[in-house]
Amino acid sequence: MELIERFLRPEEHPADFQSLAGILYSSEIWIVPTHNPEGLSVVHGWIDEQENWVQDVSYRKNKTDANQNGIFDYDPIGYGNDLDGVDLNRNYPLNWMFGDQYLETDEGCSSNPSYVSNYDYYRGEAPFSENEISIISKLMLDYDFILSIAYHSSRSGCVAERVIYPWNWPGAKLAPDYQVIQPLGQEIAELTPKEVGNGTYHFAASGSMRGNAHDWSYSQAGSIQYLIEVGTSNMQPDDVDLIENTIERNLPGAFHLMKRAAGINYPTGPDKYQIKGIVSDASNGMPIEGVEVEIAQMSGGVLAPRLTNKFGRYHRLLYYDSFDLKFSKHGYYDSYY
């Protein structure tokens, strides 16, 4: 919400005005305040039908009636043990089969072995079974976002203050666009100071394969997505000053990503290497939708074809090098550059 405020009133932030103006003039920005309104309502609390205050500040999932008994079954004490709900960051189709099944227990993590959150990572009964994910995925596919950020808060501290991006899977399987993805992830992390002031956020390629949003968004929607775990295990804090400070420390990284998408780097900023254009029919000059634009050095079988939109436009981020491009569509001769 602070990002919306900054763009609505850039004159109130003179230090960022030039960057804000450049981003607005050069790109289209969509901000989704929450992907999980049901889970957020549980965290914020509500008054039930018996006039009781109900709240679970550690709740993670949505409110899907997983055990189908018509009641919202959750445990407000501690982490996990909530019988209902689906983890929306495990409900995407890519590698969904490796996610947690219903009532699967948790083993914690090496950095916090005492943290156990049983049932919290349930993948759902099927990929895209949850309305929230169906809606978000449609948005991603409809609008061809080139970059995106998904902000999370780390209850466990296991992955606190970290920028995570696609991917470095077992067997040294790197994302085809890794030479674009990794440097930007590192730059975002290095622009984000930690809460206690001793250094900046960590950065790492995702090694997990279990229906995550950032892997699906990149592979299927063509949007390189960075998962940013803000704050430490003290989230969700009641301290308003801490919340505002956490937001403020994360803004430079967000602006840096937007400038990368927009192709601007003033007064300082990211690489500008990218390619974009419009594919048209040589016989009539009309734009052609659905042309596959393949970059030989950045292609792979796990990626969905990168297609021109209804205006014939394509847009890809690059790194400093030479590239081989192929344009293809049924009914036309292939073109190579």
Briefly describe each language-model feature range.
Residues 1-74, 83, 136:
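Active-site-adjacent structural elements in enzyme catalytic domains
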Residues 27, 53, 59-60, 67, ...:
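Metallocarboxypeptidase
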Residues 270-272, 277-290:
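Structural motif
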Residues 272, 320-322:
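Extracellular Ig-like/FN3 beta-sandwich strand-entry sites
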Residues 283, 297-299, 331-333:
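Solvent-exposed strand-loop boundary residues in beta-sheet-rich modules
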Residues 286-319:
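Short, acidic Ser/Thr/Gly-rich low-complexity loop/linker segments typical of extracellular
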Residues 322-337:
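A short, solvent-exposed loop/turn motif at the edges and junctions
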